[in-house]
Amino acid sequence: MILLADSGSTKTDWCVADGAAEICRIATHGTNPFFQSADEIAREVDGGLLPQLGNRPIEQIRFYGAGCAFPDKIAVIRDVLAARFTAADIEVG
């Protein structure tokens, strides 16, 4: 399954898909590594995303978000996600 994210500073829209089939949509508060620390982003993922995601086996993550234009900011998002989805191929842009 793939986890797609469209994130701005105020909200993040997540979609879980399996092939061409949409499995579910999840909405959380926004994430922006220019304005939030890795710890703040991690708390949002842990408290907002993971409880709604359940045990779904995520193989790929594509995170497209505000503030993800520079390598150091991309790394913040990638590191938070990689710590929680250890087997997933992660792309941040």
Regions found by a protein language model. Name each.
Residues T28-G30, D46, F70, T86:
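Alpha-helix initiation/capping motif
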Residues Q52-E91:
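Short beta-strand-loop/turn "lid" adjacent to the catalytic site in phosphate-handling enzymes
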Residues I41-P51:
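Glycine-rich, highly charged phosphate/nucleotide-binding loops
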